[in-house]
Design a protein with these regions (language model features):
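Cytosolic-side transmembrane helix boundary signature
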Residues: 1-7
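Hydrophobic membrane-insertion alpha-helices, especially the h-region
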Residues: 8-26
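Alpha-helical transmembrane signal-anchor/signal-peptide segments
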Residues: 27-51
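Short extracytoplasmic
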Residues: 43-69
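Membrane-embedded segments
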Residues: 64, 69-156
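Second-shell loop/turn segments in exported
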Residues: 93-98, 225-232, 265-268
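Secreted/periplasmic serine-hydrolase-like ester/acetyl group-modifying domain
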Residues: 133, 137-249
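Extended hydrophobic/aromatic segments used for targeting, binding, or gating
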Residues: 234, 241-287
Length: 287
């Protein structure tokens, strides 16, 4: 092949390879970005990206729910069955790794605009004063474009269609290893949205010494200078926006802040911690 033919052929080759890559990523859909039409393995997708995959799941199942938990990882500990009974509701848990309050605001708006929402339980965690509107990874922490007015459909679909094919390949490999019990690659319960704790709940705790030996993080918190909660004001602006949209649409909003270990407070300055909780109290009542 002479140089001229090679130059003319190169764009065609690139387009063919891009089409093959996009097709593979669409079929395997390791982040649940396209609704996982072929594998329907949302517990896996949500483990990779709960922000996108859970919205894809709700697009297909939203008629099964009328209430939602919203917040970062500690939100998963809220007992779905108890809240269902207490509020005569059908809850789905939209826990997201490292969710900041801007994520929560955008998703709350989407839920209320598109689905039936009777109750919204919002977990405002102390770390929400530390980060705000921060997409740390375009694949694993990306919102679904339908929940994010700042993201175009083109930007959303292109990032997942042209993603590294190793993500899709790994999904196929892990599918062959899948069992009835949760593993590290499928940690969510699809029907509730919460962490699937069937294995964790039967784990023998043993003595305090045994437990701390197995989970040394509880005795060895990171030793660093305290951090400032610089994003507290922005966080509270989003909480206020969520409260407002709930009031306007007759949604019962319950705000809580998940408890933390005493040693965890050492990560932050005392004045910042006080300001965070006092600022939240000025915006809304909370548990």
């Amino acid at each position: 092949m002479n140089a001229k033919k090679w130059v003319l052929s190169l764009p065609v080759i690139v387009l063919i390879l891009a089409a093959l890559l996009a097709g593979f990523n669409y079929v395997t859909d390791p982040f649940g970005a396209f609704g996982d039409r072929f594998m329907q393995w949302f517990s896996y997708d949500e483990t990779n990206n709960p922000r996108a995959a859970k919205i894809s799941y709700l697009e297909q199942h939203h008629d099964e729910y009328d209430s939602y938990f919203l917040g970062c990882s500690s939100t998963s500990s809220l007992p779905t069955e108890s809240f269902n009974e207490m509020l005569n509701a059908k809850f789905y848990n939209l826990i997201m790794y490292g969710a900041d309050m801007k994520d929560c605001e955008k998703i709350a708006n989407y839920l209320i605009d598109n689905y039936t929402v009777k109750n919204l339980v919002l977990n405002v965690y102390l770390d929400n004063g530390l980060t705000y509107d921060d997409e740390s990874n375009k694949l694993t922490h990306s919102l679904h474009y339908k929940t994010d007015p700042d993201m175009s459909a083109l930007s959303y679909y292109s990032r997942f269609l042209l993603a590294d094919p190793r993500y899709g390949y790994q999904k196929l490999v892990n599918k062959s290893k899948d069992t009835l019990m949760p593993q590290s690659f499928d940690v969510f319960d699809e029907q509730t949205g919460a962490y699937d704790k069937r294995v964790r709940d039967v784990e023998p705790i043993g003595s305090t010494a045994d437990y701390l030996n197995a989970y040394p993080v509880f005795t060895d918190y990171p030793n660093h200078e305290p951090l400032h909660l610089y994003k507290t004001e922005a966080c509270m602006q989003s909480v206020a926006a969520i409260r407002k949209v709930c009031e306007e649409n007759g949604v019962n909003l319950i705000v809580l802040t998940a408890p933390v270990y005493t040693d965890y407070y050492k990560n932050f300055y005392d004045d910042d911690i006080t300001n965070f909780y006092e600022s939240l109290a000025k915006v809304t009542d909370y548990w």
